[in-house]
Design a protein with these regions (language model features):
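FAD-binding glycine-rich core of flavoenzymes that anchor FAD
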Residues: 1-17, 35-38
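Internal helix-loop-helix
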Residues: 1-2, 6-7, 51-57, 176, ...
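Tryptophan-centric aromatic hotspots in well-structured domains and transmembrane helices
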Residues: 11, 15, 48, 57-59, ...
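Active-site-adjacent elements of ketosynthase-type condensing enzymes
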Residues: 19-27
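Glycine-rich phosphate/pyrophosphate-binding beta-alpha loops
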Residues: 20-21, 47-52, 94-95
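A structural signal for short hydrophobic beta-strand segments in well-ordered beta-sheet cores
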Residues: 29-32
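Glycine-rich beta->alpha junctions and the first turn(s) of the following alpha-helix
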Residues: 86-182
């Protein structure tokens, strides 16, 4: 959790799949419990995964019961993106940038499962509820990391001495702090009930 809050660890969501889009009821990615490793092992593919190429971890929705149908028999797994069983292929957009990715899991090991096997649908729906309201927090952390890199480069090449650049960096920093505080306000308001779902 400290890495998430500080923005030093970035997460992506492994929901959408080829042929199923964002229809979680048709997830084909499979998870099986490996008794020798005492861990869940993931096999399958996700697509349109935002920022997977920059992420450290992925929330992966996978089918724990191969005989289950629809939203039953799903698990919600925490998977490190830095392991041999994970392959990320950026999808190039018309602009030449790549925000979205294909992600392949080939015997990738999940560090943990949230909830019990079969409760993945419930966990995923709860997460989507938060995401719709406080997604700005993730954006803020990404932008803050980018601004920190700009400051580092400006200090290294001497551009930080330019008063115009310093003013622009200060304005960007102020805007990012406001963005963060607003997201935190929404989070705390959601917890104490002072903000309902429509406010998020």
């Amino acid at each position: 959790l400290p890495g998430i809050v500080s923005g030093t660890e970035l997460w992506c969501q492994g929901y959408s799949e080829p042929g199923a889009g964002s229809d979680l009821a048709n997830v084909k990615t499979k998870a099986r419990f490996d008794e020798t490793k005492n861990k869940w092992v993931i096999n399958g593919q996700k697509v349109w995964t935002s920022l997977a190429h920059e992420s450290d971890w992925c929330f992966v929705v996978a089918r724990t019961d191969p005989d289950s149908v629809a939203h039953k028999g799903l698990g919600f797994f925490l998977v490190s993106m830095h392991q041999p069983g994970v392959t990320v292929r950026p999808i190039e957009q018309l602009t030449g940038t790549s925000e979205f990715n294909e992600v392949f899991f080939d015997d990738a090991v999940a560090d943990d499962i949230l909830g019990a096997p079969g409760e993945g649908w419930k966990v995923a729906m709860a997460l989507l509820g938060f995401e719709r309201g406080v997604s700005t927090l993730g954006q803020q952390m990404l932008f803050q990391n980018e601004l920190d890199e700009i400051v580092r480069i400006a200090k290294a090449n001497g551009a930080a001495k330019d008063p115009v650049l310093r003013q622009r960096i200060a304005e960007a920093h102020t805007g990012l702090r406001l963005m963060r505080y607003n997201a935190m306000r929404m989070l705390s308001g959601s917890d104490d009930g002072s903000l309902d779902k429509s406010s998020l």
